[in-house]
Regions:
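Secreted, periplasmic, or luminal enzymes acting at the cell surface/secretory milieu
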Residues: 1-82, 88, 92, 145-149, ...
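Composition- and surface-driven signal marking solvent-exposed, interaction-prone regions
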Residues: 65-67, 83-87, 99-103, 133-139, ...
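Surface-exposed loops/turns
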Residues: 63, 113, 140-141
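Generic structural detector for well-ordered beta-strands
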Residues: 50, 55, 72, 105-112, ...
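Terminal connector regions
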Residues: 124-165
């Protein structure tokens, strides 16, 4: 957990001349957590969904191939509900700084209480591209992580590799 120091100042509620008190300021430094109250993609629901570990059809993605990701989502709550299943990606070895988790796909599903459903996503090399130094799309071979999760702060990372041509 990251912590940042924040300066907190207080001022009198009235001007010094109108309340008859000397003008003053109090300053204190406080430690506060540096995290969002709700992570990106977080949604509210009246039931609970369990995510299985994502299964890849291959550990490596060929330059002109596609990678299929499947995971089982189960409504383990007592009510019917809807869930937005999200696929996030991270490039571990890019030559430029890349997001820690980048949303690539999402799918909304409806499940009855106790019901399960397999959700499938497909990725291609074009989904791994970013703007290079010459401002043109580039995909660099290397290691990637992906997550299938209900928000950007959840899920279990599954590695795969983009092979060179």
């Amino acid at each position: 957990m990251r912590v940042r120091i924040v300066r907190v100042s207080s001022q009198p509620s009235c001007a010094a001349s109108s309340c008859g008190k000397p003008r003053f300021f109090q300053t204190r430094w406080r430690e506060v957590t540096h995290a969002a109250l709700y992570p990106f993609g977080h949604g509210l629901t009246y039931t609970r969904f369990d995510y299985g570990v994502p299964q890849l059809d291959a550990a490596q993605l060929g330059w002109d191939d596609t990678l299929t990701i499947r995971t089982r989502i189960t409504n383990s709550g007592a009510r019917d509900g809807e869930e937005v299943v999200q696929l996030y990606l991270r490039d571990r070895t890019a030559s430029r700084v890349r997001p820690v988790r980048e949303l690539k796909r999402f799918r909304k599903i409806a499940l009855a209480a106790g019901e399960s459903q397999d959700v499938e996503f497909t990725l291609a090399r074009a989904d791994l591209e970013f703007h290079g130094v010459d401002n043109r799309p580039v995909a660099e071979p290397g290691l990637f992580d992906l997550w299938v999760a209900p928000s950007s702060a959840a899920g279990e990372a599954v590695p795969f590799e983009l092979r060179a041509r």
